Amino acid sequence: MKKFIKMMALTAAAIGMSAGAAVAEPLKVGFLYLTTPGDHGWTYAHELARQEVQAHFGDKVETTFVENVPEGPDAERVVRELARQGNQVIFGTSFGYMDPMLKVSKDFPDVKFEHITGYKRSGNMATGNIRFYEGRYVQGIVAGMMTKTNKIGYIAPFPIPEAYQGLNAFAIGMREANPNAEIMVIWANTWADPVKEADAANTLMDQGADVIIQHTDSPAPLLAAQKRGVWGVGQASDMSHFAPEAHLLSVVNHWGPYYID
């Protein structure tokens, strides 16, 4: 599945160059985003990657995206509409799109679907991810070295495989650097809600955490950490500009090579 865009784009180019052939139509690729791309976080990283795909393949592909697509029933409607509009490849970039995409994939057997971070597949629906947990491991090492209270706060989104991957990798790195450190986890049950994220960060700091880790999308935890003089990390993109006095490091997700290759 990772090679599909490149293969189809090259096929289109070959058709276009053959003698007497009509100019090939571009490969249409659609992306579903949970939030607006903005300038930070998970969706922003995917939007940068979409732009990389468009720049890399030029007029051989036509990429579009739909933003602010909530997880659940409405996602099914949007996925179905993208398929009806002639998109030959559709990427769903949030975990909650998994079941809606699987359902729609059965009705459009000639369309290729790929669900990011999921685990359910069909004949024309694949899953994909990047090794973000390697960055979490490094975060764990740094957090274990920087904490003075030996208490590290971790704001997790939902109890799903992706979240546990990151949490476990972080814990391994932290314990290697500091066997005495402990993780205090709050499940925010959101991907991006500044109020909930800030409340979670403050609760963890009230309990003695002097490093705040987030697997949520807004800069609210970093800002809360800076306000109270503790360390924090960014999620999915460089967030250092939001809280330069508190920012330790960020896991920066670079999806471009994944989508292109």
Q: Positions of the model-derived regions?
A:
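Bacterial N-terminal signal peptides that target proteins for export
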Residues: 1-9
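Bacterial N-terminal signal peptides
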Residues: 9-18
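Sec/Tat signal peptide C-region and signal peptidase I cleavage site
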Residues: 19-24
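A residue-level marker of the well-folded mature domains of exported/periplasmic proteins
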Residues: 25-261
